[in-house]
């Protein structure tokens, strides 16, 4: 019974994070927050999986390191976008 709770809670939160990521497409900051929530739930599921199989947690630490680098890169893009355009709306941001 506890194993079902270990797997169902992160999956529900992962799906909730995906829903927030898809529904908040106007602001870059809300997209970055929901993306970090998704990565955190993936880390939690990976940690549970590795502990169930009695593996070492070095891979989860590497995953956490790369997710921190991804978050820092996203925040730097957000800061540069706000400096050039004045806001974080995707409507005012043009790739061309």
Swiss-Prot record:
It comes from Drosophila melanogaster. It holds the Pfam family Oxidored_q2. InterPro entries: NADH_UbQ_OxRdtase_chain4L/K (IPR001133), NUOK/Mnh_C1-like (IPR039428). One of its GO terms (molecular function) is NADH dehydrogenase (ubiquinone) activity. This is NADH-ubiquinone oxidoreductase chain 4L. Its main location: mitochondrion. It is an enzyme of class 7 (translocase). The keyword Membrane applies.
């Amino acid at each position: 019974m506890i194993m079902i709770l270990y797997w169902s809670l992160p999956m529900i939160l992962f799906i909730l994070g995906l829903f927030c990521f898809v529904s908040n497409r106007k602001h870059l900051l809300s997209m970055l927050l929901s993306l970090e929530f998704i990565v955190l739930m993936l880390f939690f599921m990976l940690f549970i999986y590795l502990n169930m199989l009695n593996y070492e947690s070095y891979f989860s630490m590497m995953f956490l390191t790369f997710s921190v680098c991804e978050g820092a890169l996203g925040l730097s893009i957000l800061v540069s976008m706000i400096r050039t355009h004045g806001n974080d709306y995707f409507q005012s941001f043009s790739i061309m």
